[in-house]
Structure formats: structure tokens, C-alpha cells
């Protein structure tokens, strides 16, 4: 695996793995398979982190995650900026990421000024909640632009609420311009919004259809 990892990175390719064995029962079941990597899960995580291998927790994520790495330079840091149009959906993402070895960054004074200039309440530095008032293409563009330029942020997560289903032009279409940006942008669509998801997929923007994939 280590040699494969070195060859893949030399060729500019990312390795993504899914592994059983987080639970004691899972470890026992995994041992029965030929070629299984047995042993302590913490040791395995240390091994793949050292070799730059990304691990996913849900099998279906193997299908959704490649766009997050496509043409992106992987950072050793884990600093994430989160923007949302829906407070509930944004809080769910923050909760999900808080259980990982991830630092959710402060949004900074520039974004605070954008919010104040547009009369949008700014209550939490860790979660930029645009609310309905800020779900406008020009505001989304301005806020995400600041996040993407922030040198203290390695990845940006945008959470889009019901506007993704009924008005994708407000908060989904403005995100397409960053599809090929060196900094990864992941979009979590809170409601069922197939047209918005298809739009993101067609433009190679990393989309998440379940909270656990974020």
C-alpha cells in the first residue's frame, strides 16, 4: 500500500480508501477476508495519513468524493470555512465536522463587513449564516470569494437550503465559477434538489447528498 501510494502521488493521483474495522465486531469480520489489513484502527489511520491517503466512512462517498480532489492540491492542514443559507443545515454540518480532527475557522472581518453592509445579522464567527436576506447571487459571490481567498482556510463548505430546490440561481449557480479553483469547495444541499445537484455535477463542483458525506 505504501509503494502504491508513492506511485500514485508521483503521478499526481489521489488514493481514497474505505475500510471496515472501526468496531470490535467489524475487526473480527474483516479478518475473514483475503488481503484484509488487520490491526488497530488508530494505527491504520496514522499509516494512511502519513502516506497521504484519504479515508471515507460511508461506501457511497467513494462515488461522490473524487471531484473534491480533482485538480486540487491536498493540504496537510484541516482548516474549514463554512457558509450557509440555512441556519439548521449549517449547524448540522458544523456538528458533523466537529467530531473530526478539523478546525472550523473564524470567518474574519471582511465577511463581517459584508454582512453588516447588507443588514444581515452576524452572530457567529464559525458559521456564516447568510439567512434568506443574504441568499442573493451577488452576496453569495462576495462571501465565497472572501473565503476562497482566505489563506487560513484550506477548504470551503457551502450549505444551501430550500433555495437549491426552488431558486438555484440564487445560491447554487454563483458557486460554479470555483469548480476549477485550486482550493476545494464542497456543497451540501440540505433538501432534495435534483436539478441543483445535477447542475453541480455537470460543472464538476463537489456536491454532498447526505450529511455524513461532508
Question: Where does each model-flagged region fall?
Answer:
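Tubulin/FtsZ superfamily GTPase core signature
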Residues: 3-9, 48
Amino acid at each position: 500500500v505504501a509503494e502504491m501510494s508513492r506511485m500514485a502521488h508521483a503521478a499526481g493521483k489521489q488514493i481514497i480508501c474505505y475500510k471496515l474495522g472501526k468496531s470490535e465486531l467489524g475487526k473480527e469480520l474483516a479478518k475473514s477476508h483475503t488481503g484484509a489489513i488487520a490491526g488497530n484502527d488508530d494505527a491504520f489511520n496514522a499509516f494512511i495519513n502519513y502516506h497521504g491517503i484519504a479515508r471515507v466512512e460511508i461506501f457511497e462517498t467513494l462515488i461522490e468524493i473524487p471531484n473534491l480532489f480533482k485538480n486540487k492540491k491536498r493540504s496537510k492542514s484541516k482548516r474549514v470555512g463554512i457558509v450557509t443559507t440555512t441556519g439548521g443545515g449549517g449547524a448540522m454540518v458544523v456538528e458533523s465536522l466537529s467530531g473530526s480532527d478539523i478546525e472550523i475557522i473564524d470567518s474574519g472581518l471582511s465577511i463581517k463587513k459584508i454582512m453588516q453592509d447588507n443588514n444581515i445579522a452576524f452572530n457567529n464567527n464559525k458559521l456564516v449564516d447568510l439567512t434568506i436576506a443574504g441568499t442573493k447571487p451577488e452576496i453569495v459571490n462576495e462571501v465565497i470569494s472572501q473565503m476562497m481567498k482566505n489563506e487560513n482556510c484550506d477548504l470551503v463548505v457551502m450549505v444551501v437550503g430550500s433555495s437549491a430546490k426552488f431558486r438555484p440561481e440564487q445560491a447554487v449557480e454563483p458557486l460554479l465559477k470555483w469548480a476549477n479553483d485550486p482550493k476545494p469547495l464542497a456543497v451540501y444541499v440540505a433538501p432534495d434538489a435534483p436539478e441543483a445537484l445535477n447542475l453541480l455535477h455537470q460543472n464538476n463542483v463537489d456536491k454532498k447528498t447526505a450529511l455524513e458525506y461532508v
